[in-house]
Amino acid sequence: MARQFVVLVLLTLTIATAFAADAPSASPKKSPSPTAAPTKAPTATTKAPSAPTKAPAAAPKSSSASSPKASSPAAEGPVPEDDYSASSPSDSAEAPTVSSPPAPTPDSTSAADGPSDGPTAESPKSGAVTTAKFSVVGTVATVGFFFFSF
């Protein structure tokens, strides 16, 4: 009777260890996608204030502002907040320039979400197969241990 108890305890520990080893491998796969998406979002957010700085600089000097427009954003670092408010009326003149940086931001986010959805859908299938394998192996091992412990 004591041998059966020891065998049962060892079997339980073995299966618990196998499940514990399988569970952490699924968690890190889910974590990088959300981590990658916020990393991309602030980068795009940093680019977005630069674009509104270009639009207001071009609005007052619309005819001869091609070269100064490029130099103005570099010179006007702390002023983008004021320029951003002023860019609303002149947004129609530079709409393609301002619209371009926000467009890649949603694309990058959706691209990050797309691959994360794919592996997430595959992970439960792999987990279900792994669980089924553990169930079959555990049942066979239990029957074998009890059979040989008598």
UniProtKB/Swiss-Prot annotation:
The organism that produces this protein has a lineage beginning with: Eukaryota, Viridiplantae, Streptophyta, Embryophyta, Tracheophyta
Protein's GO biological process:
pollen tube growth; pollen wall assembly
Where is lipid attached as GPI-anchor amidated serine?
S126
Give the primary localization class.
membrane
- Induction or repression: Up-regulated by AHL16/TEK.
Q: Which UniProt keywords apply?
A: Cell membrane, Glycoprotein, GPI-anchor, Lipoprotein, Membrane, Proteoglycan, Signal
Native species? Arabidopsis thaliana
Please list the residue ranges that the record marks as compositionally biased, kind Low complexity: 19-75, 85-98
| Intracellular or extracellular location(s) | Cell membrane
Record's family? Belongs to the classical AGP family.
Which residues lie within the region annotated Disordered? 19-131
Question: What is its membrane topology?
Answer: Lipid-anchor; GPI-anchor
Provide the transmembrane region boundaries.
Answer: none
User: Mind telling me which residues form the propeptide?
Assistant: 127-150
Known post-translational modifications? O-glycosylated on the hydroxyproline residues.
Asked if the record carries the keyword Nucleotide-binding, the reply is no
Function per UniProt: Proteoglycan that seems to be implicated in diverse developmental roles such as differentiation, cell-cell recognition, embryogenesis and programmed cell death. Plays an important role during the formation of the nexine layer of the pollen wall.
> What is this protein's tissue specificity according to the annotation?
Expressed in the anthers.
Q: Name one GO cellular component term.
A: plasma membrane
Coiled-coil spans are: none
Name of the protein in question: Classical arabinogalactan protein 6
Quick one: signal sequence residues? 1-20
